[in-house]
Amino acid sequence: MTFLEEILAQKEVEVAKMPLEQVAEKRKTYSFYEFLKANTNTMQLIAEVKRASPSKGEINMGVNPVLQAKSYQAAGAGMISVLTDPVFFKGSIEDLREVAKNVGIPVLCKDFIISEKQLIRARNAGATVVLLIISALTEEKLITLFEQALALDLEVLVEVHDQEELAVAQKIGAQLIGVNNRNLHTFEVDIAVSERLASDFSSDACFISESGFRTAEDVARVSQKYDAVLVGEALMREATPEVAAKSLKVTR
């Protein structure tokens, strides 16, 4: 079994036990898509709260998610990403709920979403953006969840890893497209994935490069074609995350 297959098998079990929540009032913040369109002079940062990962194991188990998120916000991050997967990433929906209560910027629910139950739960916890990973879904399921998320007034970050997936994301009209430099089957990371796919951008979407960024030089590699980068592990390992986040700022 690959990492992705193992995660999805566990996710089916998790979602089967998950209650279907009533839709509650949505948390108020700005549209991340509109924010990116209005702030094109600088590469924007999606800063992530991540305790652990399948490939790296424990990264920062003792983190206070609220203090970490506040540090990111103070550093000028445009959005906070919160891992909510409990088994492989040691996150929780409570992490997201607490972060969303304590920051004013958009919060992304970072999880392997396979059900509308997860979309409603994320919205109720304060997320205004959700992640849909093309390699984790059939195209039919992707479209269903994409439409359900939009109906819930959520923004959707559609994640791709190759040209075929990018074509699907552009075809369905995704406004936020994330290119994951990490292969979810092997968990190997290569920023060259984002460099390669940039030549196939053909929509008015905002493009985000995800994974593998440690320095401003890394960010500069994708700064001409991408609007933002998503950074997790590099920030989670730093004693001063605000300083680390500021160090990744790159002018376009």
UniProtKB/Swiss-Prot annotation:
Signal peptide limits: none
GO biological process: L-tryptophan biosynthetic process
Pathway as given in its UniProt record: Amino-acid biosynthesis; L-tryptophan biosynthesis; L-tryptophan from chorismate: step 4/5
Key words, A-Z: Amino-acid biosynthesis, Aromatic amino acid biosynthesis, Decarboxylase, Lyase, Tryptophan biosynthesis
GO MF assignments: indole-3-glycerol-phosphate synthase activity; phosphoribosylanthranilate isomerase activity
Domain of life assignment: Bacteria
UniProt catalytic activity: 1-(2-carboxyphenylamino)-1-deoxy-D-ribulose 5-phosphate + H(+) = (1S,2R)-1-C-(indol-3-yl)glycerol 3-phosphate + CO2 + H2O
Listed EC numbers: 4.1.1.48
Pfam families tied to this protein: IGPS
Family designation: Belongs to the TrpC family.
HAMAP family tied to this protein: IGPS_B
Protein name in the entry: Indole-3-glycerol phosphate synthase
Organism expressing this protein natively: Listeria monocytogenes serovar 1/2a (strain ATCC BAA-679 / EGD-e)
